[in-house]
Amino acid sequence: MVGTPLFSNAKKILLLGSGELGKEVIIEAQRFGVECIAVDSYENAPAMQVAHRFHVIDMKDGGALRAVIEREKPDLIVPEIEAINTDTLKELETEGYHVVPTANATKLTMDREGIRRLAFEKLGLRTAKYEFAESLEELKEAVQRIGIPCVIKPIMSSSGKGQSTIKSERDIEKSWDYAKSAARGIGTKVIVEEFIKFDYEITLLTARTSEGTKFCEPIGHIQIDGDYHESWQPHPMCAPTKAKAQEMAKKITDELGGYGIFGVELFVLDDEVIFSEVSPRPHDTGMVTMVTQKMSEFEIHARAILGLPVNVDILFPGASHVIKSEILKWAPEYEIHEASKVKDTKIRLFGKPIAKVGRRMGVALAVSDDITKARENAEKAAHLVNIK
């Protein structure tokens, strides 16, 4: 049951992190009459622009996080990013607050060490070979054991920040410094992973709902330096490999528990499925579902956490391509007229208050009976957007 926003009977969602994914979640939640509060570390973040109200705090500060939650008393606490004091969330959960999907899932998935040990050591899922290192010397030893090339990532980071590929011994120190710079201020530990020459990688959006677990069609994607660049749906998979992917996704999401959508990232090599990462929230590669599915990943997430039925059917093949800034500027302006002329394509601008070089500022979405054509149109439209 939901009430009326801004009245005493309102159903309240408090969103921790107010980026472009959270913005879409709030839009979908508001369609059901949910009162939405957005929280982030800076003013005028995308989700704040559509929320009923917002707060600006350091979400890694447990005291500040507790204060805003106790003030708002939300029915649902919905993390949208990883840079949150998850120990405080676990405490609040024991006091009766509802964290989506669970506080433990939020804590595990913000920590590459925790989720990798869960996947490989507890659940027996196939992963890349890995080791952890807390110093430059430990990193050198780990690289020697894993072999070159290998991938290094901070255990606490997101969107490819701090991730690099070591291609020779000369890269080790540079990769170590880069990883430390992106570690969200929580330690210096890194994970060193075997470099897998996979055939392709997918995101399998997995919805845990009151009606059971449901899977969206696989989303193929390309990342550059660990950051989302383009995605398309559906990505073709043979039935046995798809079944393996769904089995793996169900194992990891069942262990994490709760309701909502999970972005399960998988590598596929010779029809074998290899676990990479999981996010207990909508996934950036899943933005393509805004034009491909009957319900986008954001509507699915909102419905699932509210206990409502979901539909994961695909309507059209389609693609998404990021719109990135090439400048540094407050309150940027966008020339979108030419981009809007591209056939069967839509432009979605996030409304970020500052443009930075390489920052995602929007996406171009395209549909077509031919995935290749959809990808071409999305890329064309994205590159026609002029940010100035």
UniProtKB/Swiss-Prot annotation:
It comes from Methanococcus maripaludis (strain C7 / ATCC BAA-1331). This is Formate-dependent phosphoribosylglycinamide formyltransferase. GO terms for molecular function: ATP binding; magnesium ion binding; phosphoribosylglycinamide formyltransferase 2 activity; phosphoribosylglycinamide formyltransferase activity. InterPro entries: ATP-grasp, ATP-grasp_carboxylate-amine, ATP_grasp_subdomain_1, PreATP-grasp_dom_sf, PurT, PurT/PurK_preATP-grasp, PurT_C, Rudment_hybrid_motif. Belongs to the PurK/PurT family. Homodimer. It catalyses: N(1)-(5-phospho-beta-D-ribosyl)glycinamide + formate + ATP = N(2)-formyl-N(1)-(5-phospho-beta-D-ribosyl)glycinamide + ADP + phosphate + H(+). N(1)-(5-phospho-beta-D-ribosyl)glycinamide binds at E20, L21, E80, D284, K352, R359, R360.
